């Protein structure tokens, strides 16, 4: 397998495993730690299901940008920095840590969803026609294996910490694990080539004449 398709697999394994392992039940545990009400906890934990609406805006923004590689690196780099801060927020007093956690989580999820269309276009334009037919199925298979391992590790850390009355330590450990995964993913991200964009066709002379006032 060529270097670029392989790097896209590694980037997906590292970043998506870190992202999906820290949604749902793990975030619910963190909201319980901060003493959120049930209504607020449901809103926060449900963001991964409600914020995909931002993909519409993200696709339009990516289509209009003149610097696609910069757009991709900025969006993908930002949410990968913000996500571990969600768990490191427990280092602050709860009155300050709770709002910081919510802000970082909303921004991380929102920016990830905003960048999804551009990320898909980047992958397809970079590896299309250069990989075997089973590339995408192999990519998903390895992702599921990695995600399962990361999710189990995170769940065990949180459960063990809760049983020993050391929830803060547990969330810090999850933050360290997230930082390691996402830092590794950033090194891979910076190696990925610029997306290939087809040149926009100029309108035919006859068509251009029709458009003139």
Regions found by a protein language model. Give the residues of each.
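Juxtamembrane intracellular "pre-TM" segments in multi-pass secondary transporters
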Residues: 1-5, 193-213
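Helix-loop boundary and gating motifs at the non-cytosolic
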Residues: 1-62, 69-79, 84-87, 143
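Hydrophobic core of transmembrane alpha-helices in multi-pass small-molecule transporters
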Residues: 13, 82-83, 89, 95-115
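Transmembrane alpha-helix termini and helix-breaking/packing motifs in multi-pass membrane transporters
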Residues: 27-33, 60, 64, 87-93, ...
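Short helix-loop-helix connector
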Residues: 31-35, 66, 123-131
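Glycine-rich segments within core transmembrane alpha-helices of 12-TM secondary carriers
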Residues: 49-55, 136-158
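Cytoplasmic helix-loop-helix junction between adjacent transmembrane helices
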Residues: 108-141
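Helix-loop junctions on the cytosolic side of multi-pass membrane transporters
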Residues: 171, 181-203
């Amino acid at each position: 397998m060529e270097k670029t398709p392989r790097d896209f697999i590694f980037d997906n394994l590292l970043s998506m495993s870190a992202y999906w392992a820290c949604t749902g039940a793990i975030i619910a545990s963190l909201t319980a730690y901060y003493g959120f009400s049930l209504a607020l906890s449901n809103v926060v934990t449900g963001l991964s299901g409600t914020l995909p609406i931002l993909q519409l805006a993200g696709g339009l923004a990516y289509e209009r940008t003149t610097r696609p590689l910069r757009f991709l690196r900025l969006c993908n780099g930002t949410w990968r920095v913000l996500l571990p801060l969600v768990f490191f927020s427990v280092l602050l007093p709860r009155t300050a840590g709770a709002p910081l956690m919510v802000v970082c989580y909303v921004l991380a999820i929102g920016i990830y969803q905003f960048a999804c269309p551009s990320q898909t276009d980047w992958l397809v334009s970079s590896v299309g026609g250069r990989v075997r037919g089973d590339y995408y199925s192999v990519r998903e298979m390895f992702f599921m294996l990695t995600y399962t391992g990361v999710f189990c590790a995170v769940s065990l850390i949180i459960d063990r910490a809760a049983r020993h009355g050391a929830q803060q330590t547990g969330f810090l450990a999850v933050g360290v694990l997230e930082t390691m995964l996402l830092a590794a993913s950033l090194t891979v991200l910076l190696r990925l080539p610029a997306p290939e964009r087809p040149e926009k066709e100029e309108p035919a002379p006859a068509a251009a004449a029709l458009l003139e006032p």
